[in-house]
C-alpha cells in the first residue's frame, strides 16, 4: 500500500504515553516513505513498524519530529541528508531491518540530537566491532540497543577506531571505505520503492557518469552552506541520482 496523501489523511494521530503526538502507520505494507509533507510537521513521533520500507530517506523538512519507529522493515540504506531533513530526531528504532554495512550508519552522525538508537536484529549488529564503531562514529548517542553507553566503552571505542593524532585506525578505515563504494551505487528506485534498473547512457541528450566520492562530498558541503532552498533542492536531486552530466 503506497503512502498516499489520502492514506495519511485518514491515519490515526493521537497523544501517546510520552505525551507526544504520534502518527500511526503500522502494518500497512508501505514500500517507501513519501508524501509526509502533507502532515504539515504536526507530529512528534511517527510509527512505521511492520512495513516494507527499504530506504530510510525521502523525508521533507520535519523540525518537530523526535521519534521514528521503524522496526520490522527491510531498510538497508540511509539517506546521507537525513540529519538535514530531521534535525530534531532524538530516538530511532531500526530493530530487525536489513542494514548490513556499518559504514551506512555514518549518515546518522548528522542527526545531532539522536540519543536513543536501536539496531538489534540487523546484520550490521552482528559485526565484531559493531558497538565500538557506533559509539565512536555517533558520539551523540547515549543509549544503544537499550544499553546505556559507559565512559569506559567510549574510551575503548576511541582506542580501537582512532589513532593518537585523530586519524582512523586501519580497522576503522577498512569499515569506512565501504561508504565510498556504496555511495557510488545509489539506486534511485530503491528510494521510491520501485524495482527498475538503471541503464547507463544518455538522458535528455546528455551523457552522464557516476559521481566520485570527492564530488559527492563537495555536493554535501555545498548543501550545508547553501542558503537558497531552490539550490538545495537541485543539489539534493543530483546527490540522490548519484550521477553528473558531462
From Swiss-Prot:
GO cellular-component term (any): post-mRNA release spliceosomal complex
Pfam (any one): LRR_9
Any GO BP: mRNA splicing, via spliceosome
LRR-type repeats, residues: 19-40, 42-63, 64-85, 88-109
Predominant place of localization: nucleus
A GO term, aspect molecular function: U2 snRNA binding
Keyword set, alphabetical order: Leucine-rich repeat, mRNA processing, mRNA splicing, Nucleus, Repeat, Spliceosome
Subcellular location: Nucleus
Residue span(s) of domain LRRCT: 122-160
InterPro entries reported in the protein's UniProt record: Leu-rich_rpt, Leu-rich_rpt_typical-subtyp, LRR_dom_sf, RU2A, U2A'_phosphoprotein32A_C
Disulfide bond sites: none
Function: Involved in pre-mRNA splicing.
Subunit structure, as described in the record: Associated with the spliceosome.
Record-stated family: Belongs to the U2 small nuclear ribonucleoprotein A family.
Record-given protein name: U2 small nuclear ribonucleoprotein A'
Native organism taxonomy: Eukaryota, Fungi, Dikarya, Basidiomycota, Ustilaginomycotina
Amino acid at each position: 500500500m503506497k503512502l498516499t496523501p489520502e492514506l495519511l489523511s485518514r491515519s490515526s494521530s493521537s497523544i501517546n504515553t510520552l505525551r507526544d503526538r504520534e502518527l500511526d502507520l503500522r502494518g500497512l505494507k508501505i514500500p517507501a516513505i513519501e508524501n509526509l509533507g502533507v502532515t504539515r510537521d504536526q507530529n512528534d513521533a511517527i510509527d512505521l513498524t511492520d512495513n516494507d520500507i527499504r530506504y530510510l530517506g525521502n523525508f521533507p523538512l520535519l523540525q518537530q519530529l523526535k521519534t521514528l519507529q521503524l522496526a520490522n522493515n527491510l531498510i538497508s540504506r540511509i539517506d546521507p541528508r537525513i540529519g538535514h531533513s530531521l534535525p530534531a530526531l532524538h530516538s530511532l528504532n531500526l530493530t530487525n531491518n536489513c542494514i548490513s554495512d556499518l559504514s551506512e550508519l555514518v549518515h546518522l552522525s548528522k542527526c545531532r540530537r539522536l540519543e536513543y538508537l536501536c539496531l538489534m536484529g540487523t546484520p550490521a549488529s552482528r559485526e565484531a566491532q559493531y558497538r565500538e564503531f557506533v559509539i565512536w562514529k555517533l558520539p551523540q548517542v547515549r543509549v544503544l540497543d537499550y544499553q546505556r553507553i559507559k565512559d569506559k566503552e567510549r574510551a575503548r571505542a576511541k582506542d580501537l577506531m582512532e589513532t593518537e593524532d585523530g586519524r582512523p585506525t586501519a580497522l576503522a578505515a577498512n569499515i569506512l571505505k565501504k561508504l565510498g563504494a556504496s555511495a557510488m551505487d545509489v539506486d534511485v528506485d530503491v528510494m521510491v520503492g520501485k524495482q527498475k534498473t538503471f541503464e547507463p547512457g544518455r538522458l535528455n541528450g546528455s551523457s552522464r557518469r557516476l559521481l566520485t566520492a570527492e564530488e559527492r562530498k563537495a555536493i554535501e558541503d555545498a548543501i550545508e552552506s547553501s542558503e537558497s532552498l531552490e539550490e538545495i533542492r537541485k543539489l539534493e536531486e543530483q546527490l540522490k541520482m548519484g550521477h553528473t552530466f558531462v
